[in-house]
């Protein structure tokens, strides 16, 4: 199959969970013998971004096929990658790529919340369009949407297939959007060994992407409750300047840079905290940590229960249910964060810090369940789904529908995409 991913984000190198999940999915499809191309973009267009990306890629040993015009082209683990860098005309660039590559399948996803690329994909004369839902906040409907839109909802209904990262997301999509979605595993683990890194004497209680909606308030409160314990925060797309200030005020909190190899963080981690306060679609961090024997304390919201695989601990929170009509300086929608009851979290963490036998039992159970899940986690069910989609008539042709156009200029659509793109879950993981 000729498969084209419309990726309205950087793709590589990137530390976002959704970006990483899309990359591993494309590489797995390429390893199955399919011809796979990705069209992506830098965060901010221009000559400086172009030069910085070229420098970063060459420093990582990536051989560039082309980098002299408006984009950077290279092959990564069997996947053709085209990243637009200098020119803000993403829609025109993607249109040209669709015409040149002539894919049988176009994959779009919630990393394109304003549907800048989905609308073009739906107009492709031959390709089937499959939409990957990795984040409820980037859907155009429902209580967890960052931007409700009847136009975008109608466009999504014309996709030939919709695949959700969790059963929770599949139910949400059906309930609030009237869009039939199927849950198929689309967040694969890195190939290769998953070392046993869980140690009672490891240094840190860790959290990735500390910010308001991810539960930085719980993280900081735990650091205050346990002043003699070392905590580690790894800021990524959601951590604001105010969050950095709050983290640095705590003498027992180390602020660490994000890493390419998650094992570099996990081998220092005693317990992983995932105290999210919004409706997480899923979390690849939970599975990555558990597969290495790291106990995970996660909040009981969204699809996190599925990610925990029935293993302790899933803890109560007061979730954010109201979003303000504004974004922070990182363009993340701002939520009203309710007060939290720290006691359940403090009780569990206290036990994991003092009861070695319990820690080691939970570490072993976490690893056993995660590796059992991972043994059956591969791209073949998704590949079979794509083949099934190809056997059916194109949905928009069968329905005789016109592709809706939202009444927005390209400039406003780009702004809306920018306002939401950092809020996707990887999401999401």
Tell me the role of every PLM-derived stretch.
Residues 190-251, 255:
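Conserved catalytic-core segment of nucleotide-activated headgroup transferases in glycan assembly
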Residues 145-161:
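Membrane-proximal helix-turn-helix segments that form the acceptor-binding/catalytic region
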Residues 336-347, 353-384:
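A charged, aromatic-enriched C-terminal amphipathic alpha-helix characteristic of glycosyltransferases
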Residues 295-298, 308, 314-316:
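Short hydrophobic beta-strand element within catalytic cores of glycosyltransferases
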Residues 157-193, 199-201, 213:
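Donor nucleotide-sugar binding/catalytic pocket of nucleotide-sugar-dependent glycosyltransferases
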Residues 1-60, 224:
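N-terminal subdomain of nucleotide-sugar transferases
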Residues 267-281, 294:
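Acidic donor-binding loop of glycosyltransferase active sites
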Residues 105-107, 120-140:
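Active-site proximal beta-strand in glycosyltransferases
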